[in-house]
Amino acid sequence: MIKKPVIGISGCLAGSAVRFDGGHKRADFLMDKLVEWVTFRPVCPEMAIGLPVPRPALRLVRSTQGNIRMCFSYDQNEDVTERMTEFSRSYMDKLKDVSGFVVCAKSPSCGMERVRVYDENGNRGRKDGVGLFTSTLMEKFSWLPVEEDGRLHDPVLRENFVERVFALHELNHLYKEKLSRRELLAFHSRYKLQLLAHSQAGYKDMGPFVAAIHEWADLESYFEVYRDKLMAILRKPASRKNHTNVLMHIQGYFSNYLST
């Protein structure tokens, strides 16, 4: 039996009172509903580097050279960039079995996008930053489903995230337990119409690549490329138009057996 998928999660979203103000941002959908089907692995990067609760707020600061640093908001000379970077890199080794990650929006450590970045004079800059921990996460595991808590309120993005988590979980199980060309082809056969629902171009691109599986001497290298392609296609939410196209394909399979 395949175990439940493991999803990493910012500790505050799991309900732990680890935020700078001593509070939390418990994500009800995750902790009340999705928790039945997955195993969450919480982490608070800011506490992991030794910061207390409560603590002064942190912010991202862009230097005149363009480098991003993490500093305390009350004193930008108090820099914790190196500590956060060192922890983030070391923690990646603990995430080899995860199938997804949910991070806290707007956080200088965990934000996935649109995190406020200040200049060296303390002026509010553009919302174009990524939290230091999440930046390392997405760079190390580019194929991993990563979402912010706020975006999961959108039913389309929520469905897409959960779908990707379970697809990657099944693929990872195949890799660990029974990786072979036959099993990988069987996996693709099960998922190809699902890929079509997400991207017609991606579906067509995968065809020749899958057909060439026997030309690869190193199956593990092939698997890594296949995984990247699969997850890139699934990252694009399925559309009504593509769902209709999938149904037309399915109808074609049965057309010879159906009366007019």
Go through each PLM region and give its residues.
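Short catalytic helix/loop segments, enriched in acidic residues and glycine
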Residues: 23-41
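Short beta-strand segments
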Residues: 10-11, 44, 101-106
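Glycine-rich anion/phosphate-binding loops
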Residues: 76-96
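Acidic, Ser/Pro/Thr-rich low-complexity regulatory regions
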Residues: 146-260
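Internal, conserved structured core segments that host functional sites
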Residues: 89-167
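Short N-terminal binding/cap micro-motifs at the start of the first secondary-structure element
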Residues: 14-22
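Short, surface-exposed acidic-centric catalytic microdomains
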Residues: 31, 45-66
